[in-house]
Amino acid sequence: MPERLITPKGSRDDEAADFSIRPQRLADYVGQPAVREQMEIFIGAARARGEALDHVLIFGPPGLGKTTLSHIIAHELGVNLRHSSGPVLERPGDLAALLTNLEPRDVLFVDEIHRLSPVVEEVLYPAMEDFQLDIVIGEGPAARSIKLDLPPFTLVGATTRAGLLTSPLRDRFGIVQRLEFYNVQDLTRIVQRAAGILGVSIEPAGAAEIARRSRGTPRIANRLLRRVRDYAQIKADGVITDQVADRALDLLDVDVQGFDAQDRRLLLAVIEKFDGGPVGVDSLAAAIGEERGTIEDVVEPYLIQQGFLMRTPRGRMATSNAYRYFGLPAPRMTGVPGDLFGAQEEGGGEGKL
């Protein structure tokens, strides 16, 4: 399946483009006000004491700036940043090589930390807690364990699936931050800032139009900005107005809700093939030819957040918003929690279906 334009997952093109527009300081970090304020306090206090910052766990949907925040943490602390990921650290020796090369107070960023192997995770525990590395030398009866002292460091772990972290690992993070989807106002500021760095002429209304269709995700906003820039360069006078952005994004099949063909296919499958649900995620994945993990991590979070899809103990259900989106009448159902299809809106004091 071709890569979606509005997928929140990063690509190599995204990494190269995002590097030039990535903020380096918390003062330039747009959105997530609670996270920003807390990190300003924690970083300032650690810097004033000359100590390593407590280990930080950052979780939330992909594309919201977990990697960016790790870069900012290292930059604000004035230390080096070492980057790795859970799948890459296959053996304890891989982790040991990283840890023994850290300088005091350095930041080690581990993306997809929920994918660490159990044997590597066991080595990480004493490193996080006591700044010590347990190494086993030899094999069998002759094997012996030695301890290596490590410089104080900060582990920044990032994950889209915090629920998959083991309790011992999760409990060793002194700072836990959840990143939320961005509102249109913050995304508009992000688009305007990126356009300024890239030298793109953009009107406020054009930036807002891109922001509205970016699914609350900065990575998608920056990607759409680059594509709309291309359209404006060839089809317009190089200036991104709201009309130019609207035409470009319609051409790219990104509608006013930020949905693309995959979103519409999922919602229609729930409505037409499963009578609005509930439907299990495995059945839904088979119906649309997509992997379960992609549905859970990439497609459905935004649909749920926007109120088009509902996750229940019995499976996924389409909401009245989904029916209205397709111009379909919502069925009258009984026993649906939360008055899903809006019976209370129909007036009368009864509020019954």
UniProtKB/Swiss-Prot annotation:
Binding-site positions, ATP: 21-22, 63, 66-68, 129-131, 172, 182, 219
Record key words, sorted: ATP-binding, Cytoplasm, DNA damage, DNA recombination, DNA repair, DNA-binding, Hydrolase, Nucleotide-binding
Known catalytic reactions: ATP + H2O = ADP + phosphate + H(+)
Keyword Zinc listed: no
GO molecular function, one term: ATP binding
UniProt-annotated binding residues for DNA: 292, 311, 316
Positions bound to Mg(2+): 67
UniProt record, GO biological process: DNA recombination; DNA repair
GO cellular component: cytoplasm; Holliday junction resolvase complex
Region (Small ATPAse domain (RuvB-S)): 183-253
Signal among keywords: no
Self-association state and partner proteins as the record states: Homohexamer. Forms an RuvA(8)-RuvB(12)-Holliday junction (HJ) complex. HJ DNA is sandwiched between 2 RuvA tetramers; dsDNA enters through RuvA and exits via RuvB. An RuvB hexamer assembles on each DNA strand where it exits the tetramer. Each RuvB hexamer is contacted by two RuvA subunits (via domain III) on 2 adjacent RuvB subunits; this complex drives branch migration. In the full resolvosome a probable DNA-RuvA(4)-RuvB(12)-RuvC(2) complex forms which resolves the HJ.
Domain notes per entry: Has 3 domains, the large (RuvB-L) and small ATPase (RuvB-S) domains and the C-terminal head (RuvB-H) domain. The head domain binds DNA, while the ATPase domains jointly bind ATP, ADP or are empty depending on the state of the subunit in the translocation cycle. During a single DNA translocation step the structure of each domain remains the same, but their relative positions change.
Summary of the function given for this chain in its UniProt record: The RuvA-RuvB-RuvC complex processes Holliday junction (HJ) DNA during genetic recombination and DNA repair, while the RuvA-RuvB complex plays an important role in the rescue of blocked DNA replication forks via replication fork reversal (RFR). RuvA specifically binds to HJ cruciform DNA, conferring on it an open structure. The RuvB hexamer acts as an ATP-dependent pump, pulling dsDNA into and through the RuvAB complex. RuvB forms 2 homohexamers on either side of HJ DNA bound by 1 or 2 RuvA tetramers; 4 subunits per hexamer contact DNA at a time.
NCBIfam families: PRK00080.1 (NF000868), ruvB (TIGR00635)
Protein name per UniProt: Holliday junction branch migration complex subunit RuvB
